């Protein structure tokens, strides 16, 4: 299930600030909403190790400006983000929690819930072109240190495949399909501060994926790569009927399709 969550700022006549490093705040909003509706589920999600089976996009605005040298952009009109999960209980708890508490505090801004819209999912995934709504993160430990793997390395693809198969087992309880290939068309790195002193280099991508439809659907629903519950790995399918906002986000993320091309 996939939702568009649209928020209206407290003061509609002025711009609102959105820090570039904001995933942590959205994570807090999501967990607090789930907790207010289903405390047991929130505790389980907080304590369970491994994938949480949900993901969300970066925070966006209907119109925005990027002042030079500042750690935030300015948003106008409404703000919004996308949320996706394959677990109905998580979806229900989030929606109910947001409706119960429509006043939303994010960073130093106050918003009010404007609408929650259920989005139509694609009927087919094999051979589709995917565009990230939040960057994809892949990490390994090398020589005792955490290393963020780029899509120029083959290990990037094997890790994503293994991760998808693990999520498939969690979602369906069956042996995962093995058919999976990923062809990156465009890649753009972004470095994020997850928490004070903790950083992650992740990748905004345009890529084609081939393989079992159910396996690819897992990536679409709960995210590709790692740290999905921290706001990484959400994608949309290019050509699928989507919202005007998602199309605008693609334009912002990829100002030029020649910025950086790669393929392994």
Curated annotation (Swiss-Prot):
Pfam families in the record: Cas6_I-A, Cas_Cas6_C
Annotated consequence of substituting residue 31 to A: No RNA cleavage, binds pre-crRNA normally
Keywords, in A-Z order: Antiviral defense, Endonuclease, Hydrolase, Nuclease, RNA-binding
Transmembrane segments: none
EC number: 3.1.-.-
Residue numbers annotated as active site: 31, 46
Protein origin, superkingdom: Archaea
Entry-linked InterPro entries: Cas_Cas6_C, CRISPR-assoc_prot_Cas6, CRISPR-assoc_prot_Cas6_N_sf
NCBIfam families, alphabetized: cas_cas6
Entry function: CRISPR (clustered regularly interspaced short palindromic repeat), is an adaptive immune system that provides protection against mobile genetic elements (viruses, transposable elements and conjugative plasmids). CRISPR clusters contain sequences complementary to antecedent mobile elements and target invading nucleic acids. CRISPR clusters are transcribed and processed into CRISPR RNA (crRNA), also called psiRNA (prokaryotic silencing) in this organism. This protein processes pre-crRNA into individual crRNA units, with an 8-nt 5'-repeat DNA tag that may help other proteins recognize the crRNA.
Family under the similarity heading: Belongs to the CRISPR-associated protein Cas6/Cse3/CasE family.
The name this protein goes by in its record: CRISPR-associated endoribonuclease Cas6
Species name: Pyrococcus furiosus (strain ATCC 43587 / DSM 3638 / JCM 8422 / Vc1)
Encoding gene (name): cas6
């Amino acid at each position: 299930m996939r939702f568009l969550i649209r928020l209206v700022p407290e003061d509609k006549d002025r711009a609102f600030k959105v820090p570039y490093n904001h995933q942590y705040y959205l994570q807090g909003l999501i967990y607090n909403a789930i907790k207010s509706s289903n405390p047991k589920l929130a505790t389980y999600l907080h304590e369970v190790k491994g994938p949480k089976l949900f993901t969300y996009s970066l925070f966006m605005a209907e119109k925005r400006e990027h002042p030079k040298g500042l750690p935030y952009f300015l948003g106008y009109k409404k703000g919004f983000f996308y949320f996706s999960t394959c677990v109905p209980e998580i979806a229900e708890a989030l929606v109910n929690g947001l409706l119960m508490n429509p006043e939303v505090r994010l960073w130093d801004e106050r918003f009010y819930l404007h609408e929650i819209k259920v989005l139509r999912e694609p009927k087919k995934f094999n051979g589709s072109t995917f565009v990230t709504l939040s960057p994809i993160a892949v990490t390994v430990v090398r020589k005792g240190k955490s290393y963020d793997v780029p899509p120029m390395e083959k290990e990037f693809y094997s890790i994503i495949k293994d991760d998808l198969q693990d999520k498939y087992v969690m979602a369906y309880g069956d042996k995962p399909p093995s058919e999976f290939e990923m062809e990156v068309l465009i890649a753009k790195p972004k470095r994020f501060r997850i928490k004070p002193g903790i950083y992650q280099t992740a990748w905004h991508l345009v890529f084609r994926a081939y393989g079992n439809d159910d396996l690819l659907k897992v990536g679409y629903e709960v995210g590709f790569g790692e740290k999905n519950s921290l706001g990484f790995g959400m994608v949309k399918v290019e050509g699928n009927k989507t919202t005007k906002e998602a199309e605008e986000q693609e334009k912002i993320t990829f100002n030029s399709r020649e910025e950086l091309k790669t393929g392994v």
